[in-house]
Curated annotation (Swiss-Prot):
This is Glutathione peroxidase-like peroxiredoxin HYR1. Pfam families: GSHPx. Its EC number is 1.11.1.24. GO terms for molecular function: glutathione peroxidase activity; phospholipid-hydroperoxide glutathione peroxidase activity; thioredoxin-dependent peroxiredoxin activity. It catalyses: a hydroperoxide + [thioredoxin]-dithiol = an alcohol + [thioredoxin]-disulfide + H2O. The keyword Oxidoreductase applies. The lineage of its organism: Eukaryota, Fungi, Dikarya, Ascomycota, Saccharomycotina.
Length: 163
């Protein structure tokens, strides 16, 4: 079993969100922020989620305040912002650190599987993305500049793969 499925972050309500419930799904994990130039990506992320959720795809957002202090709100405020401004219905987790001594185990795992540009492991900014296949393998890592809508073809390919 992939180490991915042993992870269990905490959701915005403080409840465990065990990743073993994601077995057989294609998962896009994104570190998100409410006051970032990339925040409008929420709209494309939600469109991707709605398009593929019934085919075995999900998105998980991890709010993070490590880049320019662009996610200052409480978990409840963040969830409200996402819902009111972008109609977000995909799961949003509790605010975490994605780098440094307090980095969340989810990001420690993801970064150990796929390094970023120039082989660097650290998350560079908000809205960096990790695409995980149906077997829990980190398939690809995308920079903040990558538009969520550009991932459709890859998501479709991964959804077609037999487990």
């Amino acid at each position: 079993m992939s180490e991915f499925y042993k992870l269990a972050p905490v959701d915005k309500k403080g409840q465990p969100f065990p990743f073993d419930q994601l077995k057989g799904k294609v998962v896009l994990i994104v570190n998100v922020a409410s006051k970032c130039g990339f925040t409008p990506q929420y709209k494309e992320l939600e469109a991707l989620y709605k398009r593929y959720k019934d085919e075995g795809f999900t998105i998980i957002g991890f709010p993070c305040n490590q880049f320019g202090h662009q996610e200052p709100g409480s978990d409840e405020e963040i969830a409200q912002f996402c819902q009111l401004n972008y109609g977000v219905t995909f799961p949003i987790m509790k605010k975490i650190d994605v780098n440094g001594g307090n980095e969340d185990p989810v990001y420690k795992f993801l970064k150990s599987q796929k390094s970023g540009m120039l082989g660097l492991r650290g998350i560079k900014w908000n809205f960096e993305k990790f695409l995980v296949d149906k077997k829990g393998k980190v398939y690809e890592r995308y920079s903040s500049l990558t538009k969520p809508s550009s991932l459709s073809e890859t998501i479709e390919e991964l959804l077609k793969e037999v487990e």
